[in-house]
Amino acid sequence: MKILVLNGPNLNLLSKRDKKKYGNKDLSKIETLIKKEYPKINFTFYQSNLEGELVNWIQTADKSFDALIINPGGYSHTSIAIHDALELCRIPKIEVHLSHLANREDFRQNLITAKKTDGYISGFAENGYLAAIYLIVKILG
């Protein structure tokens, strides 16, 4: 099984962000945790602060991967381009957010991109990624 894990803007700076909201692991530690918890799955990790690069990865994901996990960061509230790319992507897709968005600012309540995924997980820090992988394994059987 091959899973693409995409991370959007500012997730490369997790070590500088509020640990109460985002957890205490930086992106490389999250990637290591994922590989340790699911050693039989082939993961490709990609992070970009650029919307177009994320769109390019999504557009080709269903050619090379069995599933997609995406944390679009702030783009989840604003990006029609990512929304549209997700709509065209024909593999299971789960959106993950480290922080508990329902407890955050009003502008974070509208998840444009999540509407084109199979579901989203919010508020469990790095464990949200593990939960998404668990669900993908169940979906793909």
Give the positions of each predicted feature.
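Short, acidic/small-residue loops that bind anionic groups at enzyme active sites
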Residues: 88-102
